[in-house]
Amino acid sequence: MACRTVGISDSVYRYRPDPHRDDEVIAKLQEAVERYPAYGFGKLFKILRRWGHPWNHKRVYRLYCTLGLNKRRRGKKRLPSRHPEPLAVPGQANHCWSMDFMSDSLFCGRRFRTFNLVEDFNREALAIEIDLNLPAQRVIRVLERVVAWRGYPNKLRMDNGPEFISATLAEWAEEHGIELEFIKPGKPTQNSYVERFNRTYRDEILNMYVFRTLNEVRELTENWIREYNEERPHDSLEDLTPWEYLDKHEKLENSNLACH
């Protein structure tokens, strides 16, 4: 009678919140954070969706904040370029690969280098070679290794580093009909695909761990490449992973060919 007087139903009056209602959401959110510690909320929410959980965005974010995950330490924010030079997106794979070098150090202080190779079309990590020294001949060996399963690209984009402007690489590229495109000095935005990839790799691997040996770097990097290509959704790829995006377009091309 009292409920009818104030205009609420008996079920609403008797409602008691379930203290364990969010347990599964919290468990899966913590699992995602543990597996992808460098991801922010947006990426983590997409991971939960990819795992098949249809939970409401606001609900997940509320729990994300309740757990204090929004207060995790972040790296320095990179100031946006005043005059960005967006690269054209290739219409197919093997049109252009971008490559670059990075450097870091082991726990003992010894420096090492990484040679990073990225497919512009689907942002796929084609290779990361790691060693104390990576001369031009070593770069060519990595390229040949990738070419063996991927085919030759039409073009390679790079900066003017000594390994890239060497006659050895120029002769190899000419032999296989590959154009070498050098960006202008001081213009990293002209190689933005691999630059963005480098930042992600540094945030999630190089800055995340202390390495005692090169083999530790290689093992962690190999696992990260698999996750990056197979599990990580990309905003620029319709929230697909690099391999999913490539597979989608290969199927589309095959269906178009079948129609002609």
Language-model segments: which ranges?
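Charged DNA-binding/catalytic regions of mobile-element recombinases
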Residues: 1-260
